[in-house]
Each structure stands twice: as structure tokens, then as C-alpha cells.
């Protein structure tokens, strides 16, 4: 299982919070102090909290649970997508559409439409249409892909949600809370930790910090899945004795 050290976090700038005037008092237990009017996060708290979160994600992934990565702001968007794809999981990195989880039935219809359009695009159907109609369908497909592409193969609700920036993604967190889906989130000094099951106090703006978080989660999921495959193979008698 991936673990992250204090050195890794210092190098990535995880300890830099927001300006002191923007702080959320609920984050006080995780703040070490302030420097140049910027809060410094106490990494002695963050390191074990993040590693505890990774241990729990490891358990979920080992039993084939689905992990949804959520990070829609510009700094997080690319890392969230890359990390989710690298471990064969799911992501929302453009805009959280209200009801994405709580109104899954409707979302499923939109995903079905997206897949229909993808088939039409691939099998030459678009070429048989008028230019205008083909353009309209292409635009519809691109729009759906942008908002739902990361969850089109999820096949149901996720078993865990990993979030970058609890404040920015508060709607997603609320939906997960309503459905009893555990929430793992990076929570900066200006954010409200309420509704987050596994709080990870840390910088949620620096790209290097975000890459550290998403990369560690992706590695944890991959290793848990691989371990599960090995165990299954041993049970089925497919692993040769060394």
C-alpha cells in the first residue's frame, strides 16, 4: 500500500494553507501556526490522517469497490483525471452536475445517450447525416463526454469518493453523505470539514500537492486490486509454487 512521508509532503508544499483572514475555525486543531499571514498546516497531523485514509481506501479497493475521484477546479482537473484513469477508476473533473449521485437514474439515461452517440460516431452513422445534424450530434456527444465521460463506465454508485477541496465540492460531498458513501477529502485551512468522513488537512491549490494526493490514492487502488487478483489466483490454484 502506498504511504506518504512528511518529507514528500514538505517537498510538495502540503503544509501551506490559506491567508489567515480566510480561515475556518473548525480547522484550528490541524493548524500549526502562521507565517507571513498564511496558515501553516500541522503535517504531524496530516501524515497519519492521510495514511489512515489510504488504508481504508485499500480495503475498499481490495473488495472491488469503486472509487470516484472528484476535483473540478482548474488546479485539480488534470491530476484527478490522470490518476483515476491510471488505476481504472472513475472521475468528475469538469463540473459537478447537481444530482449526479442522488439522481443516478436520470444520469444513467444521459450516459446511455452518450454511448449511443459514440457508437454512431464510430460506425459511420454521422457521415450519412446532413452536415448540420452531424455537427449537432457531435456537439451533444462532446458536451456529454465532458461532464459524464469519467463516470460512463461506473455502472452504479461508487463505494468511496476522494475529493480535492471540500468547500469547492460541497454539493458532491452532500450527495455522498445522503447516500452513505464514505467521503475522503483534502481540506484546506479555509474549508469546512463537516460531512467529510476522512479529513486530510492540506494544501488544496498547489498542483504538486494535488498530484501527490491523487497519485498516492491511485497507487493504493492499483496495489489493492493486484493483491486481490493474486489472492484469487492462489485460491483457484493458478499460482505455481516457487
UniProtKB/Swiss-Prot annotation:
One of its GO terms (biological process) is translation. One of its GO terms (cellular component) is cytosolic small ribosomal subunit. Pfam families: Ribosomal_S2. The keyword Ribosomal protein applies. It comes from the Bacteria. The keyword Manganese does not apply. InterPro entries: Ribosomal_uS2, Ribosomal_uS2_bac/mit/plastid, Ribosomal_uS2_CS, Ribosomal_uS2_flav_dom_sf. Keywords: Ribonucleoprotein, Ribosomal protein. One of its GO terms (molecular function) is structural constituent of ribosome. Transmembrane segments: none annotated. Coiled coil: none annotated. PROSITE patterns: RIBOSOMAL_S2_1, RIBOSOMAL_S2_2. PANTHER family: 30S RIBOSOMAL PROTEIN S2 PROKARYOTIC AND ORGANELLAR (PTHR12534), SMALL RIBOSOMAL SUBUNIT PROTEIN US2M (PTHR12534:SF0). Belongs to the universal ribosomal protein uS2 family. This is Small ribosomal subunit protein uS2. The lineage of its organism: Bacteria, Pseudomonadati, Pseudomonadota, Gammaproteobacteria, Vibrionales.
Amino acid at each position: 500500500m502506498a504511504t506518504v512521508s512528511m518529507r514528500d509532503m514538505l517537498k510538495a508544499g502540503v503544509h501551506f494553507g490559506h491567508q489567515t483572514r480566510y480561515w475556518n475555525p473548525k480547522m484550528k486543531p490541524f493548524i500549526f501556526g502562521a507565517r507571513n499571514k498564511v496558515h501553516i498546516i500541522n503535517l504531524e497531523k496530516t501524515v497519519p490522517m492521510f495514511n489512515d485514509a489510504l488504508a481504508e481506501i485499500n480495503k475498499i479497493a481490495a473488495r472491488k469497490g469503486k472509487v470516484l475521484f472528484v476535483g473540478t477546479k482548474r488546479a485539480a482537473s488534470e491530476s484527478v483525471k490522470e490518476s483515476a484513469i491510471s488505476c481504472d477508476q472513475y472521475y468528475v473533473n469538469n463540473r459537478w452536475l447537481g444530482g449526479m449521485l442522488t439522481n443516478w437514474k436520470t444520469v444513467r439515461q444521459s450516459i446511455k445517450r452518450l454511448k449511443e452517440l459514440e457508437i454512431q460516431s464510430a460506425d459511420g452513422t454521422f457521415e450519412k447525416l446532413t452536415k448540420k445534424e452531424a455537427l449537432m450530434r457531435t456537439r451533444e456527444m462532446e458536451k456529454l463526454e465532458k461532464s459524464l465521460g469519467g463516470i460512463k463506465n461506473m455502472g452504479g454508485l461508487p463505494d468511496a469518493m476522494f475529493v480535492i477541496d471540500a468547500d469547492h465540492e460541497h454539493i458532491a460531498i452532500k450527495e455522498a453523505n445522503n447516500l452513505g458513501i464514505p467521503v475522503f477529502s483534502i481540506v484546506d485551512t479555509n474549508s469546512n470539514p463537516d460531512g467529510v468522513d476522512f479529513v486530510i488537512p492540506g494544501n488544496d491549490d498547489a498542483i504538486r500537492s494535488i498530484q501527490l494526493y491523487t497519485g498516492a490514492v491511485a497507487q493504493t487502488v492499483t496495489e489493492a486490486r493486484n493483491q486481490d487478483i493474486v489472492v484469487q489466483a492462489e485460491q483457484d490454484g493458478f499460482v505455481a509454487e516457487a
